[in-house]
Amino acid sequence: MNAARTGYRVFSANSTAACTELAKRITERLGAELGKSVVYQETNGETRVEIKESVRGQDIFIIQTIPRDVNTAVMELLIMAYALKTACARNIIGVIPYFPYSKQSKMRKRGSIVCKLLASMLAKAGLTHIITMDLHQKEIQGFFSFPVDNLRASPFLLQYIQEEIPNYRNAVIVAKSPDAAKRAQSYAERLRLGLAVIHGEAQCTELDMDDGRHSPPMVKNATVHPGLELPLMMAKEKPPITVVGDVGGRIAIIVDDIIDDVESFVAAAEILKERGAYKIYVMATHGILSAEAPRLIEESSVDEVVVTNTVPHEVQKLQCPKIKTVDISLILSEAIRRIHNGESMAYLFRNITVDD
């Protein structure tokens, strides 16, 4: 497309070729070309970004997929956004299918809400809008001072189930923990299938029995009620792992938003096999697949892992043929087209509920 006529350009902020595949798919659907830029790491480890064409007065979309080197990808995005802001781009929209640090969106003891810090950094760098997909916590949208479109991958995964899983009508949707039950219920209702929930082996949070007090107790407590102590939350017990729901003689489809460390999925597959499931699928939006994930999946009872291409995982697919990919470039390219043309985004969220 002619940049002067359309008034928008699409750039990729990734410095590695493997991470630009999604950007190429999106631009092909738009009938556009990737903007001319150079992103690379200098010998001293610093990230450098050079914009090789005029972007003055245009809508700029930066596509940034997150590889294993998360911090480098974040710096690439920040520096490119700032470079485009300095070059007088009209609007700078970040297309970040998997939003990094989304697991650090809650306060834990003396930690910090890193996701909120990243949101502030992106705004300071010059971003005016973000398109993302299946945020780990929907409340993350409130961290931003500009619009965030949180698209859903579930329509693509539901379509995969209907078209690629033989005899899917004999399947049951499984939540690998009670926390994932709402997502699993949404899938089950749309496919008119049964629901099962795996419960047990609850992970205890870190206990801190030292109250950190160096001062003497309150005078009233010390004199009137010497035995009074602050009530403490009871520690969680670890009940035996169990499956709530019937999976005997069925296909089990475990659904979640992120597959990173796969030990919990492997354990879930084992218990489902013991309970009579004859085939097991794992489906998620973001396939991070860290560390030994490909080997563990290959050696496990899981028959197939289905993820979208929000995160590049071609190396993991070579290591484990069980991993399959669903392309979501269609919805991202449509979102870009609608935002640039000032059209409603409501159609992309049709039939989406708060539990999706």
UniProtKB/Swiss-Prot annotation:
Keyword set includes Cell division: no
Gene Ontology CC, one term: cytoplasm
User: In this chain, where does the modification N-acetylmethionine occur?
Assistant: M1
Which residues does this entry mark as bearing Phosphoserine?
A: S177, S215
Please tell me whether the keyword Repeat is annotated for this protein. no
Q: Which UniProt keywords apply?
A: Acetylation, Nucleotide biosynthesis, Phosphoprotein
Give the tissue specificity.
Ubiquitous.
Biological process terms in GO annotation: 5-phosphoribose 1-diphosphate biosynthetic process; nucleobase-containing compound metabolic process; purine nucleotide biosynthetic process
GO MF annotations for this entry? enzyme inhibitor activity; enzyme regulator activity; identical protein binding; magnesium ion binding
Spell out where the chain crosses the membrane: none
Cross-referenced InterPro entries: Pribosyltran_N, PRTase-like, Rib-P_diPkinase
Record-stated family: Belongs to the ribose-phosphate pyrophosphokinase family.
| Subunit-structure text | Binds to PRPS1 and PRPS2.
Q: Which NCBIfam families match?
A: ribP_PPkin
Physiological role = Seems to play a negative regulatory role in 5-phosphoribose 1-diphosphate synthesis.
PANTHER family noted in UniProt: PHOSPHORIBOSYL PYROPHOSPHATE SYNTHASE-ASSOCIATED PROTEIN 1, RIBOSE-PHOSPHATE DIPHOSPHOKINASE FAMILY MEMBER
The protein depicted here goes by the name Phosphoribosyl pyrophosphate synthase-associated protein 1
